[in-house]
Amino acid sequence: MRVIGLTGGIATGKSTFAALLRARGAPVVDADALARAAVEPGTPALAEIARTFGAEVLRPDGALDRKALGARVFADPGARRRLEAITHPAVRLAMREETARLAAQGHPLAFYDTPLLYEVGLEALLDAVVVVWAPRDVQRERLMRRDGLGGAEADARLAAQLPVDEKAARADFVVENAGAPEALAGKADRLLADLRGGRGRRLPNAPPVRY
């Protein structure tokens, strides 16, 4: 089974596109949900986090206190690397297990929906990457309208992310979503046809396939 990464930027329409893929019978796995499950109470990863960072990163019920952990690692690159050394292998194991489950069901391909695909280095585990892209001014306008933000707030949120143009430059497939949402349906059909037909990683120095 082929494993395809699906990512994008804030307000580019990735979630809408993921829903279109699901509606067409393609499994779309929420990679963030896998990451949360990997550090649930009773998991080896959570036990290692507590040993590394102390019991203060746990809530009274034994669950991970994400706010407390975030405060520990936000401004400390060394602490962040120690955390990633624990969580990344756990997430990769969860991905392999989910991939095996879907393959056993006979699916020829599956998508992993993850906003931070490039930021956490997941592309090495994937057969291809799809980026849902929109111009920055469109992202900004959508973000302001969707979340009721002012321009400065929207700009700050966009600045906190890896630019979607950079993600698109690294992708194998780019789904352009600057227009009306209904235009995405045909693009989902074309992407699935290409992937089911065997299209995958682009050649070095070749541009991504754009829809």
Swiss-Prot record:
Protein name from the UniProt record: Dephospho-CoA kinase
Coiled coil: none
A Pfam family: CoaE
Recorded GO CC terms: cytoplasm
Entry EC no(s): 2.7.1.24
Recorded family membership: Belongs to the CoaE family.
Localization terms from the record: Cytoplasm
Ranges of residues in domain DPCK: 3-206
NCBIfam families: dephospho-CoA kinase (TIGR00152)
Disulfide bonds: none
Catalytic reactions of this protein: 3'-dephospho-CoA + ATP = ADP + CoA + H(+)
Gene3D superfamilies for the chain: P-loop containing nucleotide triphosphate hydrolases
GO biological process per UniProt: coenzyme A biosynthetic process
Keywords, in A-Z order: ATP-binding, Coenzyme A biosynthesis, Cytoplasm, Kinase, Nucleotide-binding, Transferase
Predominant place of localization: cytoplasm
Cited PROSITE patterns: DPCK (PS51219)
Known role: Catalyzes the phosphorylation of the 3'-hydroxyl group of dephosphocoenzyme A to form coenzyme A.
Enzyme class of the recorded protein, top EC level: transferase
InterPro entries xref list: Depp_CoAkinase, P-loop_NTPase
Pathway: Cofactor biosynthesis; coenzyme A biosynthesis; CoA from (R)-pantothenate: step 5/5
Binding site for ATP: A11, T12, G13, K14, S15, T16
GO MF annotation terms: ATP binding; dephospho-CoA kinase activity
